[in-house]
Amino acid sequence: IIDLKLTNKEIFKQFSKGHRYEVNRKTNLEYIILDWTNYKKKQILEMMSLHEVVSNKKTRSTETWMINEKMIMNKKGFLIFVFDQKKIISASFFFMNNFSSIYFSSCTIRDYFVKTGITHKTIWYAIQYLKKNNCNYFHLGRSKTYFTSVENIKERNIEKFKHSFGGIKSLCLKTSSIPEAFEN
């Protein structure tokens, strides 16, 4: 959880060295924030199409994407699109209310991962947008520090990515059995 009441400098200082480098790295990419003020009907379907291309399948119904559109129109969400020479290469959706925001969904054409930290900068732009809109907290989602060998590599990388933004950490212990000390 990133405390948006902190200054930009204080928030940025909590990022890992690699994340700070990627945010500061110069690119020719264009980042566009779409909220209720500039969103055009059915633009969420551009994210849906990109998501299907990236995942090679349809993972959600069109109806769920249209729910995200309603959230945007009701000032409860926003999108960040990233373009390379007018071609959409990344899209992220964020839920928000008057108090907090949740990093909800994201997709990026994988070929661009090696070129630049696209999503690093997307998160930074989201933080700036949320602060400007008086949001207090930004939830990036779960990030584990311990992994078993059977876990999905992609999920592990996503969680490490989120963890490297710093912020408020809460400790949670997951076990497959109840320790003897707690039985009885």
Regions found by a protein language model. Name each.
Residues 76-181:
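Aromatic (often tryptophan-rich) hydrophobic motifs at membrane interfaces
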